Amino acid sequence: MIQGRKILITGGAGFIGSSLTLRLVENNEVVILDNLHRDAMSTTSLIEHPNVTLVRGDVLDRETVARAAEGCQIIVHMASIAGVDTVMKNPVLTMKVALLGTMNVLEVAHEMGGVERLVDFSTSEVFGRYAFRVTEGDATQLGAVGEARWTYAVSKLATEHLALN
């Protein structure tokens, strides 16, 4: 388990982010950057934990990302538009948050130096409708361009390419 690190978790107040924070917070300093749109953290006592700092903001704001990342050795980038209903109603925003948000995180990490590890969360959706027993090396498969539900998968696949290159 990771210990003694300062860790930025973008989207850290969401369902998975708050669960990850619960696992890391006892032995690390955790900075959460989140717009609190889906505030799963509110059902926990994390906000009161002395090792948690909440930066309320958006990954689309590069200066906020830079401020939140200051001094962090590890960055876990989870921020994205969540929920099929939200993605289908806001496909452009879904792409914007994924692509520009990830670019901001990657550029800030590169410019500040000292980042030991950057983890970019993706989704099994990049493997298509039947993502069963797939591995990261398997070919991706996306649906038809006209199907709005694939916006999320396309945006996450693009962020994978950004993070790996």
PLM regions: where:
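A short helix->loop->beta-strand "cap" motif at the edges of active sites that frequently abuts
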Residues: A109-R117
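Active-site beta-alpha loop architecture of Rossmann-like, nucleotide-cofactor-dependent enzymes
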Residues: D39, I81-D85, E125
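Conserved mid-core alpha-helix of short-chain dehydrogenase/reductase
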Residues: T64, N104-V108
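Catalytic helix-loop patch of NAD(P)-dependent Rossmann-fold dehydrogenases
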Residues: K89-N104, E116-R117, V126-N165
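SDR active-site strand-loop-helix element
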Residues: T10, L33, I75-M78, L118-S124
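Small-residue (primarily alanine) positions within well-ordered alpha-helices
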Residues: G12, A79-S80, A109, T159
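N-terminal Rossmann/SDR dinucleotide-binding element
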Residues: M1-I74
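NAD(P)H-binding glycine-rich loop region in Rossmannoid oxidoreductase-like domains
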Residues: V59-V97
